[in-house]
Amino acid sequence: MENGVLLQGFHWYIKPEEKLWKKLKENVDEYKQLGFSALWLPPAYKGVGGKNDNGYGVYDLYDLGEFNQKGSIETKYGTKVDYLACIQAFQKAGIDVYGDIVLNHKMGADGTEIVNAKEVNRQNTNEIISGDEQIKVYTLFTFPGRNKKYSDFIWHWYHFDGIDYDEKTHRNTIFHF
């Protein structure tokens, strides 16, 4: 197709009770008839806010609405089963599907770690404005609700290059590790 038309299949204010994955699937024929050739889906994984998170508050990339984490099993948009059924319906109709994903940050850690860090200038993060200091950071991600299904990887502070909060002093500033 030379000039396809992409449907953004979501907006910021969708409510969890709208069951987006099911709603999109129910309307796939209408979208095909309207001429859409591709569908853009929001992040499908569990965010820090559980079923109230739009997916951009990244918690667990492997939880697509399957595990009881962050207060819910479902994501804001539904379950893993609903998500996969939605994708399959669009693909069967000949509509390409693009899932959004965020890989550059995480939120809602399962624990804290003590690390050495340096404060940097908010306006120029290349400028270090403090010496080494010990801070307490939320960088330990163990995903206990998933119990190592799909991946046993545990995130630690050294998987990140910085953070914006010190639990020890309750300071909101930018630190580099």
Segments and roles (model prediction):
Residues 1-26, 34-37, 43-177:
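Substrate-binding/active-site clefts of carbohydrate-active enzymes
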